[in-house]
Amino acid sequence: MATCWPALWAYRFYLIVLCLPIFLLPLPLIVQTKEAYCAYSIILMALLWCTEALPLAVTALFPIVLFPLMGIMDASEVCIEYFKDTNILFVGGLMVAIAVEHWNLHKRIALQVLLIIGVRPALLLLGFMLVTAFLSMWISNTATTAMMVPIGHAVLEQLQGSKKDVEGGNNNPTFELQEECPQKEVTKLDNGQPVSAPSEPRTQKTQEHHRFSQGLSLCICYSASIGGIATLTGTTPNLVLQGQVNSLFPQNGNVVNFASWFGFAFPTMIILLLLAWLWLQVLFLGVNFRKNFGFGEGEEERKQAAFQVIKTQYRLLGPMSFAEKTVTVLFVLLVVLWFTREPGFFPGWGDTVFANEKGQSMASDGTVAIFISLVMFIIPSKIPGLMQDPKKPGKLKAPPAILTWKTVNDKMPWNIVILLGGGFALAKGSEQSGLSEWLGDKLTPLQHIPPSATAVILCLLIAIFTECTSNVATTTLFLPILASMAQAICLHPLYVMLPCTLAASLAFMLPVATPPNAIVFSFGGLKVSDMARAGFLLNIIGVLAITLSINSWSIPIFKLDTFPSWAHSNTSQCLLNPSNSTVPGGL
């Protein structure tokens, strides 16, 4: 029997995949309705996503098989959901991000900002957080963290080395990056036998450095998650929301676009980032703000050491290449086109130049992203000239384009594209089967709870759930249910969908919650308890910041104070309950 458990554990994923469908079979066999069939599919996929018995993208393919066989949707209708406009926006945005990463433009931006902000302890934390958050707005959180953590550790090692030299009366003329961790300090007697140096001030300095190292590591992974919420393409849950809104409410008039999302989420990100900086500063640096800002004894020497590390890394990048300059121009052009396509407060180029009969823009944010990506495939990475092939002297060779398909194929997370499509297919199947309407009817008692309280409770639920489940899977599962609930109680759907989408990015407590946390944890120096202690209060702060945003500046942006006509599932019910159709009345 003792040898049975290791075997079961080793084959646990196979057992889960085989047993789960059988265990859930009573639901469709006893309740033979389309709603039950769809519920069976959703519960099965939710459990597989939570356990990760199959890769997330593989589970996302289940609707292609289950929905046609159960009579929920035609196969052709299901497959369309896997490559919608939101998927195109995701692919196009990632292509631009891949170009930025491929030509090291993100590293140049990071080092330049750190040189400007300075390297005093509190400012160093702020500098790393600002840079990481800004980069996470445009490229993946994982790539940003993977780049920033080594830079942070190089600075920390130089700071530690500088401390030792200052205490020992030595100078540190060289500031090269150290790849190995500094050895433990020992002193030797005349006989050559090492003994520990029980210097109390030095022990205290070592403890301070360790706490500062923990704080810097956590500030990088936390700001990567926080920064991703600021833009529509910053992290995948944001795109899941846009896709779900467009799928569930086709007549919404493109209410969630790049400009409207930025107006809502960017101020939220700034507030949360500053509060996170203050919390991490207090937790790991203490409340001696004079010392935190570098006015203590010997701080100038340490500051110069860290500054030289960053300056050396920046110098190694060399001057900006033609490719970097081109990517910068195209990146800025992309952002400008996104903002001006349909800004909302003045007619955009999409509404005026490319409008249809109804006056609506025929171009989308995905159109812009793909256009800029195509340009990157056309422009050469070097100024055209008479270049010779080094392998074949005398033969001319054209430089590669700024973006090549090999580069894109190697770095593009195609699994996320499929995962997005699976979420949209689930939402569509839930709508067509009638499951969404059934859930909405069951959730009508929530209309007696104030909307603000409902939003807070749901945010806390999502924030807890996302600690142990992929944030993409979390939003994919919950957003259709939240939309149905909002329709049933005549509440603006975005009033609950927007904050819960942001809450899915509040994965601060566990290393397994999100890849940036795992990357930082893998570098060492952190325990799970350290991350949980810092992340618990940060989760609470995040929910409060989101609650503030959804009840203030978000109301005029998305018109959250009314129940929109495009969200009516039962018009007569909403007309009979007008008190529930406005957010401020329930606050």
From Swiss-Prot:
Entry's localization field: Apical cell membrane
Membrane topology: Multi-pass membrane protein
Gene Ontology biological process: alpha-ketoglutarate transport; cellular response to lithium ion; fumarate transport; succinate transmembrane transport
Family per record: Belongs to the SLC13A/DASS transporter (TC 2.A.47) family. NADC subfamily.
Tissue occurrence: Expressed in large and small intestine and in the kidney proximal tubules.
Primary location: membrane
Function: Low-affinity sodium-dicarboxylate cotransporter, that mediates the entry of citric acid cycle intermediates, such as succinate, citrate, fumarate and alpha-ketoglutarate (2-oxoglutarate) into the small intestine and renal proximal tubule. Transports the dicarboxylate into the cell with a probable stoichiometry of 3 Na(+) for 1 divalent dicarboxylate, rendering the process electrogenic. Citrate is transported in protonated form as a divalent anion, rather than the trivalent form which is normally found in blood. Has a critical role in renal dicarboxylate transport.
Keywords: Cell membrane, Ion transport, Membrane, Sodium, Sodium transport, Symport, Transmembrane, Transmembrane helix, Transport
Activity regulation (record text): Li(+) decreases succinate transport in the presence of Na(+), by competing at one of the three cation binding sites.
Region called Disordered, residue ranges: 188-208
GO annotation, cellular component aspect: apical plasma membrane; plasma membrane
Segments crossing the lipid bilayer: 13-33, 53-73, 86-106, 136-156, 264-284, 329-349, 367-387, 407-427, 445-465, 477-497, 506-526, 535-555
Protein's name according to its UniProt entry: Solute carrier family 13 member 2
CDD domains recorded: SLC13_permease
MF terms (GO), sorted A to Z: alpha-ketoglutarate transmembrane transporter activity; fumarate transmembrane transporter activity; sodium:dicarboxylate symporter activity; succinate transmembrane transporter activity
Pfam family, one: Na_sulph_symp
Reaction it catalyzes: succinate(out) + 3 Na(+)(out) = succinate(in) + 3 Na(+)(in); fumarate(out) + 3 Na(+)(out) = fumarate(in) + 3 Na(+)(in); 2-oxoglutarate(out) + 3 Na(+)(out) = 2-oxoglutarate(in) + 3 Na(+)(in)
